[in-house]
Amino acid sequence: MFVYEKKLQYPVKIKNTNPRLASLIISQYGGPDGELGASLRYLSQRYSMPYPELKGLLTDIGTEELGHLEMIGTIVHQLTRNLSEEDIKTGGFDAYFVDHTAGIYPTAASGFPWNAASMAVKGDLIADLTEDLAAEQKARVTYDNILRLSDDPDVNDVIKFLRAREIVHFQRFGEAKRTRWRVTKRAAEQNSRKSSKMVACGCLTLKSMVMGAHPLTAIVFRFPQCGHPSSERSCHSVRQSKGRA
């Protein structure tokens, strides 16, 4: 359950309207690397995370991204309030204005509306954390690009804060990936040593192997007849190949 606190994570107090800048910053509201996608990505990924601390990390960061979404919406609103018709035309805000007036709509700066295809949830610890690391860097680059184009110090102050938080999130995800990789890799290596003895399956002596995509999702494949671990072939296929030899 979420509890809403009626304040922003960082104050947004923009004095001057700037529809051109608003049409760029809206990309971090509903663009491919924006805060809407980030919040949904992390809050969705947490369900399949196998460790409580990772569920908590994704819940915390996903919730913070909702706060960042609110900040971006506030920036765009303050940049576009009380616009005149001339401001809308000369500021390059007319295309957005036709569809949404001055409402806050999740879209990219290019005009494409938000699409769930811009986020990924694989249900695999390494795949999802790697996705999250890349997502934070892409968001950081987008904020860098906004800073290159913005000349409003009030806007830049908030954007710099949001950029800094993306770096912190990147660090937290990196720590989580490294820590869990070391712990689970150690467990997988211990398990592998226990099962590395030469075993006889009745027709051929094989070295048992623990196979998997990576130590965090290690799967032991077993012969259907003798129960010994194998990399890819069944005990029956081994007997057949030996008979042909």
Descriptions of predicted regions:
Residues M1-P224:
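Non-heme di-metal
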Residues H214, R222-A245:
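N-terminal low-complexity segments that are often proline-rich with Ser/Thr-Pro
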